[in-house]
Amino acid sequence: MMKKILVVFLCLCMTVITFAACGERGGGGGDEGSAAGGEASYELVSGHVYTEDSLEHQQMLFLKDAIEEKTDGAVKVTIYANEQLGDEQTIAESVVAGSCDVGFSEGSVWATVVNKPEVAVFGLPFQLSGPDAAQEVTKELIKPEMNKLLEGTDIYCLGNVYSGFRHMLSVNKPIKTLEDLKGLKFRVPNATIYVQMFEDMGANPTTTAFSETYQALQQGVVEACECDLANIVQQNWHEVNHYMSKTYHLCANNVICINRAKWDSFPEDIQNAILEAVEESEDYCFEIRATADDEYIGAIEDAGVEIYEVPAEELARMKEACQPIYDEFEGYGLTDLLKKIDDISAKYQ
């Protein structure tokens, strides 16, 4: 609790210093903050939990450069990686509160902090068929549909950080069937959708901070975990697991959100420049992930991990076990949106 309070206090201090500096430069609003100004009149503070060598951080660096270039330096972007501003939920809460400007997390995390479970709709189990489907959903649906769901909240959706498809890893035995998950102490992020999904499949989900997962696996606190290929390698989780099951159980769409009051403080030309930069960063993200996944599979194999391709019929059984989650989201009035997502996914099967 004291750590979370300290994080929020530090974020508030940065925000106060930023606004003071902006005031000295005459960047309080109006056209003085426009892209034509050539001077940093605004600052965006962004935080995330990933390491500085992660693909997520590479996208953020691309986005930082694109925003600063497209605004002629009127907007300065500062990025705090590797949980410097707290864990994923703390950063999301800070964006809602306005003590951090920008963060990205899966919809399930945003759903928790704004208390709107329907916001997790782009992160349901076994929802998308592959990267091409994920890219089309990113381009066509995520930003507009998320902002419909976020009306009345303190955050605004800018776009998406595609973190790839997630797979399961285990220490003591391979996960080959739905029954292999029964009672397994499974590390999951602190997000309702993950807990529900693994409970529905019979596991014993345990929420553990991203940075503490390696130690939890090493010490036997948990027996299994799941993540995308890049972060499995970058977090060295392949060193403490003996098996990986390619389940593609979730497409990790880390939705980029900005504090709404901060967003509304920008003139239209700045907003347009930021949105254009986000779209370019999304394209960049899909490009670098397309070439990286084979390398990560190789690194996992080289560590001696036994990799198992779960058959389609077994994946169908796992998805069927998660049907209560889909029933819940249809109950939020999202049947039409779920069909749009399904139609896109079916195009690439």
Question: Where are the model-predicted features located?
Answer:
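C-terminal motif of bacterial Sec signal peptides marking the signal peptidase cleavage site
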Residues: 18-21
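Positively charged n-region of N-terminal signal peptides that target proteins for export
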Residues: 1-8
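A gly/proline- and charged-residue-enriched helix-loop-helix capping module
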Residues: 129-147
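Repetitive helical segments and hydrophobic/amphipathic motifs
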Residues: 12-13
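N-terminal secretory/targeting leader peptides
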Residues: 23-132, 151-349
